[in-house]
Amino acid sequence: MQISGTTTKTLMAIIATILVVAALQATRSISMPLAFAFFIAVLVHPLQSWLERRLPRWLSLILVLLLLIGFMGVAVGALTLSAEIIEPKVPEYLDRLQQMGETLRSWAEERSIPIPQFNAQDGINQVTQQAIGGIKTLLSAASLFILIVSLLVLLLLEVNQYQEKVKQAFPSRSSDRIINAVSDTSEKLRRYLLVMTLTCCLTGILTASWCFIWGVDLAFVWGLVAFVLNYVPTLGSIIAVIPPTLVALIFQGVPRGIATLLGLAVIQTILGNFVDPRLQGKTLQLSPFVALVSIVFWGWVWGIPGAILGVPMTISIILMCREFKATRGVAILLGEVED
């Protein structure tokens, strides 16, 4: 029995894909930070190039790094402020939950329905354990950030030399195609990340404003949560609506809870289904199914950071596959249908 050349190539491609995924999972401690560094480099490279035309290269690199560190400082400051806002509210929330638990327990006992007793002290202990876990996570994130910055510096130092290296490594026709494909992919990916950041900012601002209008506690925190979670398309938008809705429902009553839910759902729907696609263009859109599979798959490969990078990674693969005839079918299967 003979196997055709096409079948052999297909089998080889499948085997190679499996091996690459296994390698990425086995080397997650270095491959995941490298992916983060790559996406950051794609974002900041135009700024670095602009600065290099006016300043020495070493100074432009320092300014770009200072800008990134400043951005991270703002993010850490926002998280710290959120923690300071939440901390004094915890006892009040636990007391309220204790009262609701007792009311529910009394109602259930009258109807002979077994229900476990809620203890506020147990809640405090759980919050403390979560806080300790959060501190460990922050320490891990700090070491990860240092590694990402180190890789980013090396990437930015080498980025201006990659075209010459490609020309020396491949024949002129192939090297031109590779350089054009990488440049086009980087430009489109940069647009995607910038538009995504813009829509996340708008979502966070509108979420915080809506919660503030309806008197929902921790409005700033819910805006920050919405900003972060909307980097995870589809799934993040759904999760971002749940916490403020529950807080409004429990502490402000059913009418405000429903108003909060409806308002936040409208914000997510308009920005996710109308504003973002109009800014991105259809060629950079994923179907909700592919987006969800991307999040789950890359989350399995790299954990939570992989879930955050899932959609950008998939879009990068689609853009690169679209540039070559042999892989264009993969791009069509993963992307939206073009009119």
Feature map (PLM): residue ranges:
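Juxtamembrane membrane-interface segments in integral membrane proteins
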Residues: L47-L55, I62, A75-L147, V159, ...
